[in-house]
Amino acid sequence: MARKNSSLNGSESAELVVKKRVLEESELSDSEDERIEVDGLIDEEASENEAEEAEDDDSDAEFNRLLAEEENGQEEEYNTSDFSEEGDAFSITDKLSNVKLTVIPETSDEGIVRTKYSDGRPRILKSEINPVYDSDDSDAEAKNTIGNIPLSAYDEMPHIGYDINGKRIMRPAKGSALDQLLESIELPEGWTGLLDKDSGASLNLTEEELELINKLQNNQQTDESVNPYEPLIDWFTRHESVMPVTAVPEPKRRFVPSKHEAKRVMKIVKAIREGRIIPPKKLKELREKEEQDSHNYDLWGDAEEISEHVMNLRAPKLPPPTNEESYNPPEEYLLTPEEIDAWEKMEPSERERNFVPHKFAALRKVPGYSESVRERFERSLDLYLAPRVRKNKLNIDPESLIPELPSTKDLRPFPIRCSTVYVGHKGKIRTMSIDPTGLWLATGSDDGTVRVWEILTGREVYQVTILNAEENNDDHIDVVEWNPDSTTGILAVTAGENIFLLVPPIFGFEIENTGKSKIEYGFGFDTFGNVKKSNLNVNSDDEDDGAESHAVKKQVAQWNKPTERQAANDICIVITCRKSVKKLSWHRKGDYFVTVQPDSGNTSVLIHQLSKHLTQSPFKKSKGIIMDAKFHPFKPQLLVCSQRYVRIYDLSQQVLIKKLLPGARWLSTIDIHPRGDNLIASSFDKRVLWHDLDLASTPYKTLRYHEKAVRSVSFHKKLPLFCSAADDGNIHVFHATVYDDLMKNPMIVPLKKLTGHKIVNSLGVLDTIWHPREAWLFSAGADKTARLWTT
């Protein structure tokens, strides 16, 4: 009975669906009538369906069986009252005979039919969509109507779903393997290689889709309604309008910077400075940095930093590579085969370098450095074993170390140019001297002559031949020195072992007579029984035992009258010493003068007295080779210069006062300041040394301006000037202010570098001397000339 009911219900449901479809079609076709009777139509349609169902019982047996199985699960949900005999008494035709359809007039929504369900509820039937011609789905092919059901559910069945009428949709036939191979070789037009999920058939492109794809590939316009070559509309003309469109004057705000915009800009600037607004570029960098930090995890990021120990010393940096270590060094750095052989034969510890420079055409051709491991190992040993000391660096401004010197313009006058050149000598001019009056210049040369020049005009006024240069090549004139007493006019000349005192006939009768008389007074000194004392002794150093020798010393010099030939040349007396006299210096009063004979041993320094014709040797022994000796300007002291030391002796007490240590290898000459508190010394090792006698025995200043041996230094007698001359042919002029305040150090300022003398046989300027009153400088050189340098 249950099966019967289920079959009846299934047939009734199918019958109801078919009748509903027919009813809707009839309503659409007869919509012009307001009310239509549908009883006869439904009966006819039902009878026809019953006949068709009877004929198709065998074909639809399986279909009914499947429907019955599907509805078996729903039998329990239906009430028995729904399947009572009373309900079965009424047919579908009888139920639908009472249904009335109402067509809404044209004033309402078009195509909408309002009706009622069997239970009386309102029902709206909308007409089927009548697509227009431009609709996308107007010409679409019929698709599968199985709904959104995956095809995998029908993999084991011969069909793939059901159509709207409930009939099966069979699976499309598949060709054989040969057909599939042919299809893969000869692809049909529009082939995509895809399967339609609704029908299971191959999905091909239509002609319209193929045409659209071709247009896209060829960069053509896909929409045919768009004209790419429309006529141009000239919105802006190239002709300038003469009259304005409007004559409204421009407002002032067009020409004045906007205050509101300035405020907004300042707000933005302030926000950027405070970090509230980050520029895009910086924001991008921060993001990149964050990403990089996130990828590169710092293993020791959370580790605590341990401060270094106070005594920790960092490893010194490696020295930068030199030209020899280049892969393409200059040719002069490459070793010759002989040098390479010598390098290979040397012990590794004795080699200057531990590699041989090589030259490569390109950096990519440079091989690996074989000594890198060994060098790193040795450096590690040095850092591990070699002691290191922390050296504190002094943060001193270099400019603060340079003293503030006044401008040279404020220190004038000083010589700056050559005014006069005295030409006439045929040999090197070794010495020169200025008359105390400042009018006459005396020069001595290797040609054996002494010449006297008028300073202002440069005219030679006197010449005397002291030596015959052709016969005596060993001796030459070393010193020419005027007597400081301007009333005598005596000129002292040293040549070899002899000292000549002469009075040139250029001063007048009174001065010449006074000078000759002063020289001749000494011959009558012992006429009245006077005894010449020759036992003057000055201790040479503090190590002497102080014992005095009362024995009479041998005569160290002879005072002889000149010969007739010498007297004819205005020579008044000749003093003969044991060795060649190289230096001579007068005492300020003009009665004493000191001479230096470097080769004479303990008699190297002799003091001569003009009024008594007396010569004394102050030292019983000599320490080293004596180079120069001078009297103190106003104290009874004698300054003796040896090769490395300068000693100051007190002649009245006959003791050594001070010993100066210039620090030079070989001193050449000295000169003392007119005030007597400072001394300068020159050396053959290109240095000029300034000593302050009130300070230490070491130099106060060391001047290294010359490039060759310094031959002469000289103080000006009146002005704060001094100079130095050397074999490089240059004369350096300095300003030297000595203060009365003993707490102030002397101020030394370089003023001028005078160049003019030529270098002959590695000899330049041999002697210099200042004018007694003016800021004039005289120089004598190996180029056989003497020069006057003036302001």
UniProtKB/Swiss-Prot annotation:
Q: Where are the WD repeats?
A: 424-463, 472-512, 576-618, 621-659, 662-701, 705-744, 760-791
Q: Where is the composition biased (Polar residues)?
A: 1-12
GO BP terms: namely: maturation of 5.8S rRNA from tricistronic rRNA transcript (SSU-rRNA, 5.8S rRNA, LSU-rRNA); maturation of LSU-rRNA from tricistronic rRNA transcript (SSU-rRNA, 5.8S rRNA, LSU-rRNA)
Region of interest called Required for interaction with YTM1, as start-end residue ranges on this chain:
372-408
Cellular localization per UniProt: Nucleus, Nucleolus; Nucleus, Nucleoplasm
**Any idea which UniProt keywords this protein has?**
Nucleus, Repeat, Ribosome biogenesis, rRNA processing, WD repeat
Subunit details for this protein?
Component of the NOP7 complex, composed of ERB1, NOP7 and YTM1. The complex is held together by ERB1, which interacts with NOP7 via its N-terminal domain and with YTM1 via a high-affinity interaction between the seven-bladed beta-propeller domains of the 2 proteins. The NOP7 complex associates with the 66S pre-ribosome.
Cited function: Component of the NOP7 complex, which is required for maturation of the 25S and 5.8S ribosomal RNAs and formation of the 60S ribosome.
What is the recorded name of this protein?
A: Ribosome biogenesis protein ERB1
Protein species of origin: Kluyveromyces lactis (strain ATCC 8585 / CBS 2359 / DSM 70799 / NBRC 1267 / NRRL Y-1140 / WM37)
Organism taxonomic ancestry:
Eukaryota, Fungi, Dikarya, Ascomycota, Saccharomycotina
